[in-house]
Amino acid sequence: MTIIWSIIIVYMLAMVGIGFYAKTKIKDSADYHLAGRRLGPIMLAGTLAATEIGGGSSVGVASKAYGEWGLSAGWYVVSAGIAIILVSFVAPFMRRAMATTVPEVIGRRYGKSSQLIASILSIVASSALTAVQITATASIVHVLTGFDLKLAIIISGAIVVFYTFLGGMWSVTLTDFVQFFIIVIGFAIAVPFALSNAGGMEHVISQIPKEQLGFTKIGWGTILGFIVLYFMTFSTGQEAVQRYYAAKDEKTAIWGSIMCGGLMTLYAFIPAVLGLIALAAFPNIEENSALATVSVELLPPVIAGILLSGVISATLSSASGNLLAVASVYIKDVHTNIFKKELEDQAELKASRLIVVITGVGAIGISLFSQQIIPLLVFAFTIRSTGPFAAYLLGLLVERVTKNAGLASIIVGTVVGITWEILENPFGIMAVIMGSSASLITFLVVNQIELRRGVDIAPTAYPKE
């Protein structure tokens, strides 16, 4: 255990060190929020992959494989990989907008009311997503140290708040780049060791109920739902879109997205396999502890240290991206809307750091209240995506749209999505499908009615040349 902890502590100190280094690169708020719009395709792919391969795609997938989904839990990540490849078709339009936030673009086209609603949805969802990643990190710390889970949550939250506070998007991007390679290496080398120490593949398979080995146990409807869910959240979620805004050009946005999708698909089933190994070797543990238990009990200390550093890096990366998303949206959209004036650049930088701290404290509170990982992830994705989805994407892609079409679609989509989620997805239809469908239909109907009545076309989403 000492070796495992030594590796993890060295990793943590390295991340804090990168935060201090990134702080020296921060000259203004554009550097803090967008890394100066200088990300190349490899850096973009790395930061996207590390951000999206978070607690849900590591600890969450392993726990679902241990539990009700079995091997098919890997489709949760494959779906995300497919979705982010699809986002490559709209990525250049995002970059062309030269914006900082999703609500900023919505505000340009549909007005301040739409911008404020989208901002609130984004802040609530990103805060919840930060809490999910803190919970995933804390579950590892809890198993390794024996600390009370609530204490582990507080420690994990404090670390991610600290290095995001220091370096903003530069620290997030640099740590993401390092973290992605740790994730891949850690998981790739863990499987053969875990299999061998659990008694070999034949023994592991013999200990697992046959239905847990079903490749598509979760069902094609759920898989399709996840693809739609992730396409929506990657194309409207601030922590993902902010990275496209930070790309150095439109071509970079396309190739970074495609490369990220490929990397995620290659990684997808590794956590699921480790979850099944945990089921075979430790059939009576808590689901969320599956990955950490395999690491501690079945892997050599050095390999366990690398794997758990990879898991912690994945969750911290996602958490930092969401913290920064909240700061960006509040400063660029909420503050400007409420107080009717923009902050001076250095004042904006200070305010952004303050918001990171406040959001981090709030996320720790959410994490202390609820330790569910994937259910909270899906609910957060539903909140932030179902309403703004049609308004944001059609606002980028279609010239002839009206302000009221955007506002109506945001309200209707959000209400339908949240209501459907509260009703626990009647008829097996995911809330994100119902909400986004309602949003799209509302947008198209209102837009057609208003265009026929001669209502003015909304201003463009793009800055003037």
Question: Positions of the model-derived regions?
Answer:
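Membrane-embedded helix-loop-helix hairpins and adjacent transmembrane boundary segments
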Residues: M1-E465
